């Protein structure tokens, strides 16, 4: 199996994002190897050795995605036996021409602790943790969005991703079996914040699978219970005109992006 390397003199997040985005277009499996903080020539030569060993082991030239500011380190990596993709060289020079301004690369700037949005994102993460699963209703005034849905429909990971990636304060509220009764109704606590609500739903068989991993052979995980709860929440969404999304086939990243697109919430990442 071919190996893909993601290399940087910073966190390597940018190299990973670009590289994964490109590789996801192809129905091919890869071994992934991320190497951050390659800041010296000595470290760069060690990375070259890893790339060479991968080539020797697999017989296939590795794919090498890298974003390296240090010119000397970058030159060393560019000599690897792999197929090299230097994102900075490919994109910076054309941008300099268009903008009429030379770039001023700085290590760690992209994902630095010094970026102005760092405190905003950390505050949003703390908010998401404090307002998980309807645990702190008194803070809903601060929420940018309140995700609702049945247990295990993706509310918590989506809330945390929105916070960490975009600085959005996302609370989440679960609808449980006790809420169902004869017919699920919007709780008075939520009605006041109806304009902030966004619903998540999921296919019953997928919910059954997820819950069974947590509590096998329980009523909570039974397909009948899953179908009943999902039917009730989807009826509520339609009745109350709450926008909602079926999360079954989407990653957390995709769910979050779709929520932002539908609600118009502004990212606080940059």
Swiss-Prot record:
Disulfide feature: none
Gene Ontology terms for molecular function: ADP binding; ATP binding; phosphotransferase activity, phosphate group as acceptor; protein serine/threonine kinase activity
Catalytic activity line of the entry: [pyruvate, water dikinase] + ADP = [pyruvate, water dikinase]-phosphate + AMP + H(+); [pyruvate, water dikinase]-phosphate + phosphate + H(+) = [pyruvate, water dikinase] + diphosphate
Keyword annotations: Kinase, Nucleotide-binding, Serine/threonine-protein kinase, Transferase
InterPro entries, A to Z: Kinase-pyrophosphorylase, PSRP
Enzyme Commission code(s) on record: 2.7.11.33, 2.7.4.28
Record-linked HAMAP family: PSRP
NCBIfam families found in the cross-reference section: PRK05339.1 (NF003742)
Entry's family note: Belongs to the pyruvate, phosphate/water dikinase regulatory protein family. PSRP subfamily.
Function of the molecule: Bifunctional serine/threonine kinase and phosphorylase involved in the regulation of the phosphoenolpyruvate synthase (PEPS) by catalyzing its phosphorylation/dephosphorylation.
Name of this protein: Putative phosphoenolpyruvate synthase regulatory protein
Organism of provenance: Alteromonas mediterranea (strain DSM 17117 / CIP 110805 / LMG 28347 / Deep ecotype)
């Amino acid at each position: 199996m071919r190996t893909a390397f993601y290399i940087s003199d910073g966190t390597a997040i940018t190299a990973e994002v670009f590289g994964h985005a490109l590789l996801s277009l192809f129905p091919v499996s890869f071994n992934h190897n991320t190497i951050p903080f390659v800041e010296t020539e000595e470290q760069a030569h060690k990375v070259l050795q890893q790339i060479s060993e991968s080539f020797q082991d697999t017989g296939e030239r590795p794919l090498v995605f890298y974003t390296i500011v240090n010119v000397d380190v970058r030159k060393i990596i560019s000599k690897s036996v792999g197929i090299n993709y230097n994102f900075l060289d490919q994109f910076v020079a054309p941008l300099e021409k268009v903008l009429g301004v030379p770039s001023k690369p700085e290590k760690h700037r992209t994902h630095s602790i010094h970026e102005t949005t760092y405190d905003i994102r950390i505050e949003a993460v703390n908010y998401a943790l404090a307002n998980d699963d309807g645990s702190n209703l008194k803070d809903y005034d601060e929420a940018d969005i309140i995700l609702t849905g049945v247990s295990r429909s993706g509310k918590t990971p989506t809330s945390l991703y929105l916070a960490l990636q975009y600085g959005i304060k996302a609370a989440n509220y679960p609808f449980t079996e006790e809420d169902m009764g004869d017919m699920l109704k919007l709780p008075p606590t939520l009605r006041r914040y109806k304009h902030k609500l966004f619903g998540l739903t999921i296919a019953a068989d997928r919910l059954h699978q997820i819950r069974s991993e947590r509590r096998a052979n329980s009523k909570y995980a039974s397909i009948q219970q899953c179908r009943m709860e999902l039917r009730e929440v989807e009826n509520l969404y339609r009745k109350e005109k709450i926008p909602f999304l079926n999360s079954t086939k989407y990653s957390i990243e995709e769910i979050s992006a779709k929520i932002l697109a539908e609600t118009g919430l502004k990212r606080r990442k940059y």
